Structure formats: structure tokens, C-alpha cells
Curated annotation (Swiss-Prot):
GO terms for molecular function: structural constituent of ribosome. It comes from Candida albicans (strain SC5314 / ATCC MYA-2876) (Yeast). It is found in: Cytoplasm. One of its GO terms (biological process) is cytoplasmic translation. Keywords: Cytoplasm, Ribonucleoprotein, Ribosomal protein. Component of the ribosome, a large ribonucleoprotein complex responsible for the synthesis of proteins in the cell. The small ribosomal subunit (SSU) binds messenger RNAs (mRNAs) and translates the encoded message by selecting cognate aminoacyl-transfer RNA (tRNA) molecules. The large subunit (LSU) contains the ribosomal catalytic site termed the peptidyl transferase center (PTC), which catalyzes the formation of peptide bonds, thereby polymerizing the amino acids delivered by tRNAs into a polypeptide chain. This is Large ribosomal subunit protein eL33.
């Protein structure tokens, strides 16, 4: 039997990019599991992110939907990354789990 390989790493949607008074919902801040420094986070630049959720209405035989995004750059000194999604993630996803795909590979 073939050996299974990891296709993604788990992460959490922390917040939008923001200043003291202005929030920017175009840019989401993501904390990746096991990443604690900007040096480690650089590996994930350009990787695809999927927010997978279950919707009440079935479309084309499935209630599962996905919002896709991409890691654009690091954020701060704790290993957070900034990500842009095709459609902005709604605020109810703060704290929700996202999948950071291990492709496209840059090694």
C-alpha cells in the first residue's frame, strides 16, 4: 500500500490586518501551526490557503464549500503570515481552522 503524504498544514485565522482604528478586511492574519519566527514563515510564502466550511444549502450535491487564498508575506516577529483570499473571509471565521497547502513548492 502507498505511503500517505501530508498535503497541508493547519493554521488559524487570527484577525484582519489593522491599525489602532482602521481594519483592512482584504488582508487576513494567519497563525501556522509549528511556526514561531519570520524565518520559519518564509517557507510558506506563495503557498495556497483553503478555508473549508459547511453551508446549509446543498449545491451540486455537496454542502462543503471552500474559499481559496494565498500567503503573501510575513507579519511581525511571531511567525504570523498575511494572506489574501479570493473573497474576504467573514469575521465569524476568527479563530477558525484553515489549511495551508504545501504547494506550489519553491524548493
Amino acid at each position: 500500500m502507498a505511503e500517505s503524504h501530508r498535503l497541508y498544514v493547519k493554521g488559524k485565522h487570527i484577525s484582519y490586518q489593522r491599525s489602532k482604528s482602521v481594519t483592512n478586511p482584504n488582508v487576513s492574519l494567519i497563525q501556522i501551526e509549528g511556526v514561531a519566527s519570520p524565518k520559519d514563515a518564509k517557507f510558506y510564502l506563495g503557498k495556497r490557503i483553503a478555508y473549508v466550511y459547511r453551508a446549509p444549502k446543498e449545491i451540486r450535491g455537496s454542502k462543503i464549500r471552500v474559499i481559496w487564498g494565498k500567503v503573501t508575506r510575513t507579519h511581525g516577529n511571531n511567525g504570523l503570515v498575511r494572506a489574501n483570499f479570493k473573497k474576504n473571509l467573514p469575521p465569524k471565521t476568527f479563530g477558525a481552522s484553515v489549511r495551508i497547502m504545501l504547494y506550489p513548492s519553491n524548493i
